[in-house]
Design a protein with these regions (language model features):
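Short beta-rich binding modules
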Residues: 1-107
Length: 107
């Protein structure tokens, strides 16, 4: 388990950590997100405007499936609405920044 410093304090994280940010004052900077996900940050914009931040190379690194983030993914990107991506999954630590909490990441 590792620790990372985010605006809401220092967190101990494991591979299945799923953090939800819903306040602009808690929006993390890139370095903190990179530390949290353990590498390069991939940003996925959800149809409702929320952003999911995860490790871009997580699958190549063999990170374990993140059950909470994968559940959100499968509930959002359903087969009836999306030709691809509906059967995908999220691995490693992930952060969801709610649309109303976006500041820096929205640019």
């Amino acid at each position: 388990m590792k620790t990372v410093k985010l605006p809401q304090g220092t967190l101990s994280i494991d591979a299945n950590e799923f953090l939800i940010i819903d306040d602009k004052k808690n929006e993390p900077q890139y370095k903190a997100v990179s530390d949290f996900v353990g590498g390069m940050v991939e940003v996925v914009q959800f149809p409702n405007g929320d952003l999911l931040l995860l490790n871009e190379e997580g699958k190549l690194m063999g990170l374990p499936v993140n059950e909470k983030a994968s559940k959100l993914w499968s509930e959002t990107f359903t087969k009836d609405k999306y030709a691809f991506g509906h059967d995908d999954f999220v691995v490693g630590p992930a952060i969801l920044i709610k649309k109303d909490a976006l500041n820096t990441w929205a640019n």
